[in-house]
Structure formats: C-alpha cells, structure tokens
C-alpha cells in the first residue's frame, strides 16, 4: 500500500507532503512511538480522540512523540490537525511528513477497513462474554494446524484500537488465508 493510498483511505490531508514519500510502500502502522521502525506510519493519538471514541481514563497525548517517531525513522505521522499548533516548534521541520485528520483513531479504523477489503480473505470473529482470548487462541491453533496461514489478534487486542492494529498486519502479510479476530463488543454489530 502506497503512502498516497493510506492518505486517501483515511481521508487525510498532507498539503506539504514530500512527493518522494507519496509512492513509498507502507506496511507497518504503530501507535507507540517506542515501537517505530524505519518506514512505519505513526498514528499520534490524543486525549480528545480517546474520549470521542469511548475510551475511559486519562491517556497520554502521543502527539508529543511525533517528532521523535520521525527521527526514529517513521515515514510519516498521522495526527489531528488541531494538535499541530501545540507542538509546532518540534513538528515544523517535519511538515513534509505530516498527515492531518480530524480523528486519528477513526483514521486508523478507516485504514484497517481499507486493508481488510483489499485482502479479501476469510475471517473468524470471536466475541463472547468471557473466554474470547482462549477461544481465539484455540481456533487459530486448529486452523494453523490444518495448514492454513492464520493471523490472530496480538495478545487480547480486541477493542477499537487493538482490532485495527491486528487487521493492519495484513498490509505487510497478505499471504494469510484466514484471520481469527477477537472482538470486544462495545457498539452494535453494524458499527464494527
């Protein structure tokens, strides 16, 4: 998936994008700046997004780590356009690698939807009151033992952040035959 395709899929704007980056193949997407590797796209999540997307609690504004993610090799950073001003001093040298959106969590989810559609493989969705992680693990094990290349959620990443991060692994590993996805249900099924 080219960076230009990512920008289009998330409804982002990159007015100063370095055109050499537009054709860059992007395969890995992260929300933790400490995990950035060369070529990754870093999604900088902020407190308003967490609240707007139903996450309770106090979360760190990862926009403060956007410049360090770029210094660590990230190809680009996706951030809320209204967060730039607060971090303008650190981000100004990097404007050619910034992608602006209204909501970085929603953008991450839109990108996962686009990757899923491009992949087109089979999905086993696991959602129950208790035992999702165990059921996911057993199902993935049986499918893998039958010779199918199987993707499964990392740990118990089953919410509005973890689920998209798992699906986005298909951008780098499209050879999977099936994805076993554990999903915590906080919204009606038609909104997932």
Residue locations for each model-derived region?
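N-terminal leader/targeting and accessory segments in enzymes
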Residues: 1-110
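Phosphate-binding loop of NTP-binding sites
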Residues: 107-192
């Amino acid at each position: 998936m080219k960076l230009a395709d990512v920008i289009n899929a998330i409804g982002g704007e990159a007015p100063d994008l370095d055109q050499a980056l537009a054709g860059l193949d992007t395969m890995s997407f992260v929300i933790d700046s400490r995990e950035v590797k060369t070529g990754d796209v870093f999604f900088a999540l902020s407190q308003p997004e967490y609240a707007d997307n139903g996450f309770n609690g106090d979360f760190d504004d990862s926009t403060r780590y956007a410049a360090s993610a770029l210094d660590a090799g990230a190809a680009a950073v996706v951030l809320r356009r209204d967060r730039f001003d607060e971090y303008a001093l650190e981000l100004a040298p990097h404007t050619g690698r910034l992608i602006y959106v209204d909501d970085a969590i929603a953008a991450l989810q839109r990108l996962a939807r686009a990757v899923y559609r491009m992949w087109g493989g089979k999905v086993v969705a696991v959602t129950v009151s208790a035992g999702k992680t165990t059921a996911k693990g057993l199902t993935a094990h049986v499918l893998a033992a039958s010779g199918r290349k199987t993707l499964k959620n990392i740990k118990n990443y089953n919410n509005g952040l973890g689920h998209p991060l798992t699906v986005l692994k298909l951008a780098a590993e499209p050879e999977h035959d099936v994805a076993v996805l554990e999903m915590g249900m906080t919204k009606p099924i038609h909104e997932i």
